[in-house]
Amino acid sequence: MRTIPLLPCASIDEIAEFADHLGFRVTYRQVRPNPYIALNRDGLELHYFGIPGFLPEDSYGSCVVITDDIEALFDAFAAGLRAAYGKLPVSGFPRITRPRRRKDNDNRTGFSLVDPSGNWIRVTAERSPVESPSDAPVSRLRAAVDNAVVIADSHGDAAQAAKILAGALARDITGRPEERWEAEEYLAELRERLAD
């Protein structure tokens, strides 16, 4: 059994060009009676259907991609996006988030790719048979980072996530250095998103 997501877009040609940067190839293209395109990258299939006048801001399109090598897939996507746009796009359409542990996904690592039509392609790590969510207590700063990741990377609210992290960093004067570094790095990324 398998499933292939069908995602809305304004232009199948725009999606084909974008997908080419990510290493996808077009396996099917139809203009009439309805615009439709099928893409494949190493067995990962995404299909798009065109809707004239479709706006990325109005998209509720989303799908989940589960992979056993999240870092390799992120690195390949990031390299293609940097080559196409001169930098890693972290705001607007398209954009990508960096891989992070996600408390809303059983603490598995994941990232989100938002295509030019506003569809969220949520990439998550495959869970190993022995892996389970951690029930270990976390520091207040670690909890703030986890919450900020959900708010910014899953819900798209970078401004609220930045407020959470800035407040947590201001209150945390005794935290572990690696947690402070991670929080400061993520806050800088959020501020970059907001500045774009």
What feature does the model see in each segment?
Residues 2-10, 56-82, 85-196:
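Vicinal oxygen chelate
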Residues 27-62, 67, 120-125, 192-194:
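Conserved short beta-strand elements that form part of the metal-binding/catalytic scaffold
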Residues 7-46, 159-175:
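Core segments of cupin and vicinal oxygen chelate
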Residues 2-14, 41-48, 85-90, 127-130:
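Short N-terminal helix-initiation segments at or just after the protein's N-terminus
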Residues 33-36, 51, 80-89:
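Intrinsically disordered, low-complexity boundary segments flanking structured domains
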Residues 1, 29-41, 74, 78, ...:
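Phosphate-binding glycine-rich loops and adjacent basic patches that engage nucleotide phosphates
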